[in-house]
């Protein structure tokens, strides 16, 4: 289903002219060898541009790259472009004392020239290709001039730098001319394609995917020779037959989705998250903002995207009634292969509804300093040690995304990490962090399928008689009394007693209630009456004798939300506060 969905995406985008035709791809070429129509070298030209502070090679629509690997990879040359070993016979690291590297460069160059001749035989009157052949007819002379060019040192700074040829009077590389006939590669291997269901030439080696941290030749589909996974003596790609056309379609689609300027992917640690829809929809444009960090040049973009989603039923901003599918793919690359960690296929309408429910479940009263909605990354940062995402289990992100998209309960692992951080950091760095933790616990509890308790509300619920929730409220009241009685403190009862009160309230409740009586004596008469009444109203609903010896993790979560709700009630605007000064 993954490959079929990618092929369908390619077909749709190619029909709109947004993807290259079969046999071509968008390729970054950092340097061009400029020649005249006689094949004489003119100059080296850099195409690199400054994009977001980084140098990026200009993209050209060139003949699609061929897969190559193993000790005979030198024999496979790309069509009209390749790295400096193939195009200029340069040895690795420019080490002319390494005889093996010199021979390899020469063999690569011979393969490239043979490929140019093959294409020239199909395009006998093409001026550009004939100029390349003429260039190699006077190769030694041209190489002497290339080595004196001011950009030569920069060109050879890194191995594997791709280059192509450009005629001096043209603006694009010679290979960018789509009228050039490339000729289909002959293959003896034909079979039933698993993607299209048609009998076609099979790709023995699938094309590589340009993914971050993916090494040199990462592939989504690959087989190692003689690895023990060969069926019926079939080698490599013949074990899972995918046609050359389908291989081209799915890799072109995936590489387009992964392109630097594409908004159809984002990153989480070493994972790459790719998504797309089979019909144009605002949800596809906004999807990454639901889960990623906001862009530096538009810090409110995430909140705007979520706000549009939440208002969509009334405003029509996000047309979630579109009858189409939405796809999500989480990939984790290594040196040679790409692991699929998560694959989601759902309808646009269903996913929009599930996402709306997800953000509604996360909605909780908060300070005016906090953002209106919480994207996933800030949420996860709030429960990570030192707010570093690398300190979280890799699977947590995938499970959170899956919960949001499918409308499932949140992973218990998220609850556990959240409670750990609350106990380890009684006073979080910011109101946003505190809000995120409370929001996560509220969403976790309300989405439990077997939750027999009252649903937790966005703000303080005085009708909620859950014992853990009431204990949390009581603890917040006792802490507030202490703060008003003793002024600014380096530490409050929260620093010393939060962990024990939230786990085993019976052990410390009586002691803290007695302590609060001493604190009440230091308040004004009006404050004493107000807090005595508030404390009494909560305590009369707590069955002290019936409290469990230990609160479960779910009840510890209710305690945390009760505490948070009550604290937020205290810190409303002055005109809404009931405290008597």
Where do the PLM segments sit?
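Short, non-ligating residues that shape and space the ligands of small metal-coordination modules
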Residues: 199-203
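Short Cys/His-rich metal-coordination motifs, predominantly Zn2+-binding knuckles/fingers
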Residues: 196
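Conserved phosphate-interacting/catalytic interface
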Residues: 1-188, 229-581
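Short microdomains enriched in Cys/His and/or Lys/Arg
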Residues: 204-242
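Cys/His-enriched microdomains
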Residues: 191
